[in-house]
Amino acid sequence: MPTLNMEKKNFIFKDLELKNTLVVPIIRSNMTDTATTRTQWDGTVTPANGETEDNLFNESHDWQFELRNKFNLKYTLGRHTFNLNDQFVFSDYRPKDDRMNEYLGFDPSSFPSKMTSNNIGLSYLFASSNNRFQNSLTISIYYLKSKIYRTSDALSKDKTESVFAPKQTNVNKTYYGFSEGLSYELWKGVRGKISFSHNVRIPDTGELFGNGMSIKPSVNLQPEVGDNLNIGVIMDKRNLLGLTRVQWETNFYYMYMKNMIRLFPADIRSIYINLGKTSTLGFDTDLKVDITPNVYAYFNLTLQDIRDRQKWLNDEKGSDNPTYDKHVPNIPSFYYNYGMEYHVEGLLGKTELSRVYVDVSHVGEFDWGWQMSTLPDQRKKWIIPSNDVFTIGLQQSFWHNNVSLSFEVENIFDKENYMEFKMPLQGRTFKAKLRFNLFRDKVSGGAMSM
């Protein structure tokens, strides 16, 4: 993936910092499904057109070209900091499947989907002379232009010609956002904070275009627009109770969102759609402890209640919404993870780094569909059971930290676990990763960092 980074201090004039990152992903995805038979669970072999449930042959060779650019200008004047940030994305998705011509009646490669988005924000940060009081104000403008051809939907005839063509959806809108945050150091190393924001999240290309297989292109997908309130406490103490360093952050938050983007079933596939109105009331806490300079432990936990707040099926008071005030499915309400690692420098060489770690994650049970019944048998049908995943691993650097080698065993007890939509997670899994720092870039921390 071609990437170009550029950084410059004192750009144009003193104290003006420039950072720019340009990434050009080029993605080729292929799916070949030409199976003529299907084997059932009991061993019975039946005729089929492909293995997927839509009973259609697939031989796709899709291309996706993207251009992503992040631009940032930062200027500091005494206790005042000004920051201009721009994030631009252009994506061109070109599906191609010759077998589709046989049952769709058109060549999907003639109908590329495109998306252009831009997010520009200007922020102002003020810090008092002793940094005890800090204030941050940001104003943002968001732009989204998308043209999506729903090549997996039913065909519609062109109004001007007697030919079949895929349905098309267009979005061309501009949005605004802002955020205001205050923090104050209550005691040395302990800071309280409060923030309010009106944010917009532009859908990404995977949500808009689908994946050409199990996820369909989205229909009139709109950006998420949310109002957020956050109140929290941050602590950062060194040499506390004999510990090298203790970092702790906890937050209480409330979010009211319009057009929340979620993945839902659509016929035999899935599609990203907008939920009209939702609310989130939550709490999270994150604890990091350097027990000694070489031993590190952590724990984080999240509790959240996300509910549908669309009382009517449309903006006019007509039909009641049957899912009103119910939990939004496929989002866990309770999860946590904790772990510990031992890291050391110089064990296998003067500048080499070594790490051994263990990680445990827990996700409480949650529903994978709207819970419409109070009957125990029906509720059990839609519940994804809680799961625990234990992971151990080690990492070692070589060649003056320009090469790192890591091994990891995930789900070491080989437990049966499920994710969203009750899709099974992998059992015991062995992973290995080799990383190179070919240009010996010290700014990135080498091939491995603590």
Question: What role is predicted for each listed range?
Answer:
Residues V24-N30, L77-R79, F88-R94, F126-N130, ...:
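Transmembrane beta-strands of outer-membrane beta-barrel pores
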Residues M1, N30-A48, R94-Y103, K147-S156, ...:
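Outer-membrane beta-barrel translocator domains and adjoining extracellular loop/strand segments
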Residues M1, N5, T52-S60, N101-P112, ...:
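Extracellular loop and loop/strand-boundary signature of outer-membrane beta-barrel proteins
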Residues R79, Q247-Y256, I273-W368:
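Gram-negative outer-membrane beta-barrel transporters
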Residues K9-F13, T76-H80, S117, A127-F133, ...:
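Outer-membrane beta-barrel channels and translocator barrels
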Residues E185, G192-S197, P223-L281, T302, ...:
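Membrane-embedded beta-barrel scaffold of Gram-negative outer-membrane proteins
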